[in-house]
């Protein structure tokens, strides 16, 4: 209410202060780190712009990137590096044991993209530190994305429109995202936990686990993105879309064009293309792809699981480029789609496991490793209890429900539903609230990144 009551010139200040309070509520120790990051990015951009066409401007740009990455390195990767150095004979360095600041991977990339864009001349340096601070700390997408570039909301930081229509659209998108998280992802999370803890593991229980895990991660992360985009609209911002039904893809290449779009485009524009992209010799192209995907894996987490996860996708993309990509294009959709789903099932098990051996043990369960039975009494019970949810979630992860709904809304009966829709949304909100009150604490999975 304070935001909407504030004069236009003070709206950014109100939003900035509120965003810092929101962040401090969860991470009070790291408000200073965020403020230092904001001031650093703001000052460096001004200096870079003054030296834009000189060598000193390039040097300043690299220094600004190094400063931003140093914060990420210290808080996210220091202990990972120390643990690996400690594997050397006679080395025993103490761990820093620093907790990971929430959202640091997201706002660090936003600051880096901003300073690089200023150096490239793609945007002017922001001269109002409150406006820049609002861009970095904007609370709807601060914690788990999407990764918003300065150029995405540059105009809206200066002047944005507010309307009942835009706010209503934002509320609707927020409630859809909340429902995805609470009513689908959290319940699927219950199934994954049950399958991991069952005393009667079977091949069926492991396949149920794999399917539920992929759908849980999708609805959890896309749900947060929906909530962030919805809140952004309420405050007059148009954030970029972050998902486009990735689970309907028929290749790894297509999947990553549809999944976490803001991260993929960030690595493309600020790492892959500067390295030369695909317009280089084959050896350099292979290097570029593997480097980008190992970095993508490391962005998700400081462990060899994520390095292997990212490198694996890099290898698969190279295989699709040089080996079986054309074959996939000629195959019927169902075959290429099953190929993609099989890869995603295996890769997300690696993504969610704590260690590589643990991931291999879980993947082995899919194929009966350890002489597992095909089914067990417990797995059949779980299938009866959660089978309909798995089917519903699988359908909801495709465009079919939205397409059918849009067609229905064009009919006479659909026009009546327009009047009922607010009641439906309120019902979803109340149901999600009831689930939250009755359930345990279930943070968004991408909070840890």
Feature-to-residue mapping (PLM):
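Membrane-embedded transmembrane alpha-helical bundles that form the catalytic cores
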Residues: 1-448
